[in-house]
Regions:
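Noncatalytic partner-interaction/assembly domains of nucleic-acid and motor enzyme complexes
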Residues: 1-123
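Short, exposed beta-strand "edge-strand" segments with a Pro/Gly-rich flavor and a Y/T-containing core
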Residues: 19-20, 73-77, 142-145, 160-165
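Extended, charged alpha-helical coiled-coil/arm scaffolds that mediate oligomerization and mechanical coupling
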Residues: 95-163
Length: 165
């Protein structure tokens, strides 16, 4: 087997490694606003496989899940209903936030592209987390753990990302 030389990172590459995970808050806001503004888009977007965990921002995850839940229960998704669900949430001012979401909603013609971007960015975050887990496991490798175990765990994680998104 041919011996390969180790990869040596310079300080800039190490600093780049500490950057923020990929996300697009504007896309998340535009999608949520579009779903509130036009409830007919909800089924179309949920059929794409978009789930709450695909959103980067935690309260966007909550909002999306409530929208899907309300829609599945046959309820109209409106600012008024959402506001009442989130009025005890101290994280944001639900009144102005929901109005802002609707005001900045994506056009229904590009909504699928916006949803796909949110999904793709989520996949990238999951891949980065898997790579970081692999890196940590590789550095923490002990004599009682085989390299093949780490490879197998990583393969399983990648397969799950591929299957579940």
């Amino acid at each position: 087997m041919e011996q390969s030389s180790p990869i040596i990172l310079n300080q800039n590459q190490v600093n780049d490694h500490q950057q923020e995970l990929p996300h697009n808050l504007e896309a998340e806001q535009q999608l949520l606003g579009a779903l509130i503004k036009n409830n007919e888009l909800i089924d179309r977007i949920s059929q794409l496989g978009l789930k709450g965990f695909h959103f980067y921002e935690a309260f966007h995850q909550e909002i999306y899940e409530k929208i899907i839940q309300m829609n599945n229960n046959g309820k109209a998704v409106t600012i008024l209903f959402l506001k009442t669900l989130f009025e005890t949430n101290d994280v944001f001012d639900s009144d102005s936030y929901f109005i802002s979401l609707v005001a900045n909603a994506s056009h229904s013609l590009v909504i699928k592209d916006v949803a796909n971007e949110i999904y793709e960015l989520s996949i990238r975050r999951q891949l980065i987390q898997t790579a970081e887990s692999l890196e940590h496991s590789s550095y923490a490798l002990s004599e009682d753990r085989e390299v093949s175990e780490i490879i197998e765990e990583t393969e399983i994680q990648l397969y799950e990302i591929d299957q579940k998104g």
